[in-house]
Amino acid sequence: MAEQKKIRVTLVKSLIGTIESHRACARGLGLRRREHTVEVLDTSENRGMINKISYLLKVES
């Protein structure tokens, strides 16, 4: 079975002052603090969360 693709996501801006739903998306992606980097699976759900808070993130494939 082929390995699923992953996306590396880094939180580059603080969550202070953002909308609660945007903070929930960051938590859903596993991001806890500024400059925190995680690798998430390349699924439509994760891509939707990344798209919603793209102004806070740096994304690498």
Swiss-Prot record:
Keywords: Ribonucleoprotein, Ribosomal protein. InterPro entries: Ribo_uL30_ferredoxin-like_sf, Ribosomal_uL30_bac-type, Ribosomal_uL30_ferredoxin-like. NCBIfam families: rpmD_bact (TIGR01308). GO terms for cellular component: cytosolic large ribosomal subunit. Gene3D superfamilies: Ribosomal protein L30, ferredoxin-like fold domain. It comes from Neisseria gonorrhoeae (strain ATCC 700825 / FA 1090). The keyword Ribosomal protein applies. Belongs to the universal ribosomal protein uL30 family. Transmembrane segments: none annotated. The gene is rpmD. HAMAP family: Ribosomal_uL30_B (MF_01371_B). CDD domains: Ribosomal_L30. SUPFAM superfamilies: Ribosomal protein L30p/L7e. The lineage of its organism: Bacteria, Pseudomonadati, Pseudomonadota, Betaproteobacteria, Neisseriales. Part of the 50S ribosomal subunit. Pfam families: Ribosomal_L30. One of its GO terms (molecular function) is structural constituent of ribosome. GO terms for biological process: translation. It comes from the Bacteria. This is Large ribosomal subunit protein uL30. Disulfide bonds: none annotated.
